[in-house]
């Protein structure tokens, strides 16, 4: 028998054996797909309207999601502003597929999802150009101190002499000949490397999962260990997904391995950096300056936390990924992945299933019934409302978004809500970072 067919049948048994199949019948019986942490479904609706009912929840936690969605939704779209732990996932009774709009998925317990029969997908191509551009902006800002010079001008400090210029612009440095160290050479890491070379950086990288030879094709130098990269870099930029192996990758110990006066940039995941250790290093001058787009606790505030008094620090609110074009592109791809899931089978029909291996390991085959299962994803709970975009109100009634669905229910105005990027962790050309440092 074809080994690929056997493998697909095994995955079908996992998904269909743990949870019932999705019913995709004629109106009004259509599967329910819910946008968990947003309200704007105007991009997703044209792609899904003929196969599903699309609801929005605008929730920041599962406690804010109505029971109707928890009990009937078979598909979920989500950004980075909500977290799904095992406890959260267990509240969904019919869920079969989760799409993270963006590449990072550390806010989802993908192993527990697999054990519950839920496939998790991401959009690994989302916002690569935007994140790389933002990373270079942060790097240039640290070297040329644009933020601090602008702030001085706003405060009325207009230098009139060379001595005053030296005082205000102190710390500005020449880029040519500096060494940029990249941790994680996936899509975004490579895009950053190519941009940095144009600014005459010498670019080195550390990525234990990258195939040999990529460095030669890109004209980069590969470091064998993380310590070697830290010791040779004048500026370090992180492009790693967050997992149990690299949490607080930048900590007191690794900071002491860096060059004195090194710069640090993080546009990947906040948990990669121990902010307490970073704050102390900035105060001591061991790290000359840092630029963070992501933080351990978000939304970030300068008024609290270990970084509140740290000098030479630039912070932006997890927006390095954003452009209108990138947002639309990611949302379209997420909706198409949901559509593929409805057509089935799961997970073979999916392009970017990040917990496929966990799905395969979720069930002991010796104890499973060997009867054939339906190969298509035609099933889970049906939704009694007709296809369209609905918002589930506090009373549990569906409400249409104006201009999308004809309805006698009160209209809820749509508010734009956009996705978050990140990086993937699969050990293949599509993954964004080393999963084990």
UniProtKB/Swiss-Prot annotation:
The active site is at residues 269, 298, 318. Corepressor targeting diverse transcription regulators. Coiled coil: none annotated. Residues 415-426 have a biased composition (Polar residues). Residues 427-437 have a biased composition (Basic and acidic residues). The keyword Repressor applies. The gene is ctbp2. GO terms for cellular component: nucleus. It is found in: Nucleus. Belongs to the D-isomer specific 2-hydroxyacid dehydrogenase family. Keywords: Nucleus, Oxidoreductase, Repressor, Transcription, Transcription regulation, Wnt signaling pathway. NAD(+) binds at residues 103, 183-188, 207, 240-246, 267-269, 293, 318-321. It comes from the Eukaryota. GO terms for molecular function: DNA-binding transcription factor binding; NAD binding; oxidoreductase activity, acting on the CH-OH group of donors, NAD or NADP as acceptor; transcription coactivator activity; transcription coregulator binding; transcription corepressor activity. It holds the Pfam family 2-Hacid_dh_C. GO terms for biological process: negative regulation of DNA-templated transcription; regulation of transcription by RNA polymerase II; white fat cell differentiation; Wnt signaling pathway. Residues 410-437 are annotated as: Disordered. This is C-terminal-binding protein 2. The keyword Lipid metabolism does not apply. Its main location: nucleus. Interacts with the C-terminus of tcf7l1-a via the consensus motifs P-X-[DNS]-L-[STVA].
């Amino acid at each position: 028998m074809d080994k690929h067919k056997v493998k697909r049948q095994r995955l079908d048994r996992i998904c269909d054996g743990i949870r019932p199949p999705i019913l995709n019948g004629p109106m009004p019986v259509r599967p329910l797909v819910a946008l968990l942490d947003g309200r704007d479904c105007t991009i997703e609706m044209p792609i899904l309207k003929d196969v599903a009912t699309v609801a929005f929840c605008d929730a920041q936690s599962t406690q804010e999601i109505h029971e109707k969605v928890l009990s009937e939704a078979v598909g979920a779209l989500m950004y980075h502003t909500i977290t799904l732990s095992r406890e959260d996932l267990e509240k969904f009774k019919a869920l079969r597929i989760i799409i993270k709009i963006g590449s990072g998925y550390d806010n989802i317990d993908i192993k527990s999802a697999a054990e519950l029969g839920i496939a998790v997908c991401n959009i690994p191509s989302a916002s690569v150009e935007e994140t790389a551009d933002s990373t270079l902006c942060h790097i240039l800002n640290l070297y040329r101190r644009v933020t601090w010079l602008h702030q001085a001008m706003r405060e009325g400090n207009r230098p009139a002499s060379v001595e005053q210029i030296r005082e205000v612009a102190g710390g500005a440095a020449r880029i040519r000949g500096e060494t940029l160290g990249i941790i994680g050479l996936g899509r975004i890491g490579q895009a950053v490397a190519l941009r940095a070379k144009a600014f005459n950086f010498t670019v080195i990288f550390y990525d234990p999962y990258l195939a040999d030879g990529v460095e030669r094709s890109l004209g980069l130098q590969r470091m064998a260990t993380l310590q070697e990269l830290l010791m040779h870099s004048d500026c370090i930029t992180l492009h790693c997904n967050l997992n149990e192996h690299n949490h607080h990758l930048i900590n007191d110990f690794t900071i002491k391995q860096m060059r004195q006066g090194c710069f640090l940039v993080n546009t990947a995941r906040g948990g990669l950096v121990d902010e307490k250790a970073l704050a102390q290093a900035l105060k001591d001058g061991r790290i000359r300056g840092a630029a963070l787009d992501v933080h351990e606790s978000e939304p970030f505030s300068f008024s609290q936390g270990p970084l509140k008094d740290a000098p030479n620090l630039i912070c932006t609110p997890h927006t390095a990924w954003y452009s209108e074009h990138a947002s639309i592109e990611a949302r379209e791809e997420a909706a198409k992945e949901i559509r593929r899931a409805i057509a089935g089978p799961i997970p073979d029909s999916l392009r970017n299933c990040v917990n496929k291996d966990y799905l395969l390991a979720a069930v002991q085959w010796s104890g499973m019934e060997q009867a054939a299962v339906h190969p298509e994803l035609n099933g889970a709970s049906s939704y009694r409302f007709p296809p369209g975009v609905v918002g589930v109100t506090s009373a549990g009634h569906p409400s249409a978004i104006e201009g999308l669905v004809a309805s006698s229910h009160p209209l809820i105005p749509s508010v734009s809500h956009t996705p978050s990027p990140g990086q993937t962790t699969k050990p293949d050309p599509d993954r964004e970072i080393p999963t084990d440092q």
